[in-house]
UniProtKB/Swiss-Prot annotation:
GO terms for biological process: tRNA splicing, via endonucleolytic cleavage and ligation. The lineage of its organism: Archaea, Methanobacteriati, Methanobacteriota, Stenosarchaea group, Methanomicrobia. GO terms for molecular function: NAD+ poly-ADP-ribosyltransferase activity; tRNA 2'-phosphotransferase activity. It comes from Methanosarcina mazei (strain ATCC BAA-159 / DSM 3647 / Goe1 / Go1 / JCM 11833 / OCM 88). The keyword Transferase applies. InterPro entries: Ptrans_KptA/Tpt1 (IPR002745), RNA_2'-PTrans_C (IPR042081), RNA_2'-PTrans_KptA (IPR022928), RNA_2'-PTrans_N (IPR042080). The keyword Transcription does not apply. This is Probable RNA 2'-phosphotransferase. Removes the 2'-phosphate from RNA via an intermediate in which the phosphate is ADP-ribosylated by NAD followed by a presumed transesterification to release the RNA and generate ADP-ribose 1''-2''-cyclic phosphate (APPR>P). May function as an ADP-ribosylase. Belongs to the KptA/TPT1 family. Its EC number is 2.7.1.-.
Length: 207
């Protein structure tokens, strides 16, 4: 459920996390899920099939996107898109003026123009079966445009636990990689994107 606090904006759940007031009802769980799936799919994977035009940086026109969604969901209102984006705790989407895009997770070919990360080390969680292959060949994107790395050990472990019960965390020497010309783009506070990570910059962290 998405609600709106007059002081702190949109939030998910029954009360504002900052002031604990219930705020104004905006969107129920069912509609939030439907919109979320369509927004994620369109901005990351199938903009053309959804009927919107995406530029090389992943941006699409917000008003045009709302019109597409209104045709699909007759209950759709523009506010719902803002509510979905602004209440998203993972920061998956970005609105800038009249445009909207996904911050990460793309399978379509985009050139995300983020600033370079200044984190000296970033992290990648893998299954035990993957480790030797990664140390030999490096990390390449699978079904996505970019390799997704974490800015903290804890986040890398959290992500890896989705896919394996016994994650192994690889540390990436980001500072040295960038000195050697490898771009590491800061997508969110916790996510760094790269075209690939060669094996020379990878190290296994022991528990």
């Amino acid at each position: 459920m998405i609600r709106k606090c007059t002081d702190h904006g949109y939030f998910r759940g029954g009360s504002c996390q900052q002031c604990k007031r219930p705020g104004r009802y905006v969107l129920d769980d069912g509609r939030e899920e439907k919109l979320g799936r369509f927004v994620s799919g369109t901005l990351r994977h199938f903009p053309a099939s959804a009927g919107v035009k995406m530029d090389k940086y992943g941006w699409i026109d917000l008003n045009a996107f709302c019109e597409v969604m209104k045709k699909r969901y007759n209950w759709m209102r523009k506010e719902y898109l803002y509510a979905l984006v602004e209440s998203d705790e993972k920061g998956r989407y970005q609105i800038s003026g009249p445009m909207i895009r996904a911050r990460y997770g793309h399978s379509v070919n985009v050139d995300l123009d983020y600033d370079e990360s200044d984190t000296p080390y970033v992290y990648y969680g893998a299954s035990p079966e993957e480790v030797d292959v990664l140390l030999e060949n490096g990390i390449f994107p699978i079904k996505q445009r970019y390799v997704h790395l974490s800015t903290t050990y804890e986040k890398a472990a959290e992500v890896a636990l989705i896919h394996t019960e016994s994650p192994v965390i690889l540390q990436v020497d980001a500072f040295r990689a960038q000195e050697d010309g490898i771009s590491l783009k800061l997508a969110t506070d916790y996510i760094v994107l790269a075209e690939k990570i060669p094996p020379d910059y990878l190290f296994v962290l022991e528990d």
